[in-house]
Amino acid sequence: MQPICDRELHEECGVFGVVGVPDAANLTYYGLHSLQHRGQEGCGSVSVSKEGAMRRVRGEGLVTEVFNEAKLANLAGDMAIGHVRYSTAGGGGTENIQPFLFHHNTGDFALAHNGNIVNADLLRNYP
């Protein structure tokens, strides 16, 4: 029996998050940069300030193309989550770049995942 030699990467997307770290967005930036081999279509990050305000930056392109010093400075806070995208479903465009930021009557939240949300339409219309 011949051994199977597979020399291709089979990694899709990357998620990085930190809690309780000063300048969390900067650490998340470097985390996303180190995960960039997992997705190069786009990236994004959401930070949470001490007051609970959420801010997001996202865009198409490499991590170094999407973020700059001014954008990172706007992401003040000690919590952040980021995502690099490699699409397996859905189209391109900024609207599909994570993290997603939701404003709900129960509170705001950000979500980044590595997979497909198959019931997104149902969840979108949930009361």
Regions found by a protein language model. Give the residues of each.
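N-terminal glutamine amidotransferase
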Residues: M1-D121, Y126
